[in-house]
Regions:
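All-alpha prenyltransferase/terpene-synthase fold signal
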Residues: 1, 5-159
Length: 159
């Protein structure tokens, strides 16, 4: 819920506000709000994935800190739903550990449970929904191309 609220503030609301200020139609405002929500969520999921499977250098921040901080990201929640690994994932997330072996074990579980692939696919699906939201709405062609490029960049970025 917090993630969705944050995406409203950082993605959906600014785009909708821009459309309102620019004199956009109700259809344009709603399309840009939906686009911002979907791309904002996709961006966050990609950020979570980079924190887990990127490199410390590429992430340009602390590596695997989401595990240390016990964040219940989409990846973690998906892995927790697997009964075979629930207790171990819960223990690692609750421990506050920064032990590289424990962090690597968590990522190994995330891979074994398909949680990383699940999150990546979900982010791609959100990107498709974002693009569909603006597909049949009248927009400046250059603005449309920029929005579509941004949507792709958000899930393809490496840092």
């Amino acid at each position: 819920q917090m993630c969705i609220r944050d995406r409203y503030y950082s993605g959906a609301t600014p785009l909708a506000a821009g459309a309102i200020i620019g004199g956009g139609s109700d259809e344009q405002i709603e399309a840009l709000r939906a686009f911002g929500l979907h791309t904002g969520l996709a961006f966050q999921i990609q950020d979570d994935l980079l924190n887990l499977v990127g490199t410390k250098e590429a992430a340009n921040k602390d590596f695997r800190t989401d595990i240390t901080e016990g964040k219940r990201t989409l990846v973690a929640v998906h892995a927790l739903s697997d009964e075979r690994h629930h207790d171990e994932v819960e223990a690692i997330l609750s421990s506050g550990t920064d032990d590289p072996a424990q962090l690597a074990r968590a990522v190994e579980i995330f891979q074994e449970t398909g949680s990383i692939d699940y999150a990546h696919t979900y982010a791609l699906d959100l990107t498709a929904k974002a693009k569909a939201a603006i597909e049949n709405v009248e927009l400046d062609p250059h603005a449309r191309e920029l929005f579509l490029s941004m949507a792709d960049f958000f899930v393809e970025r490496l840092n």
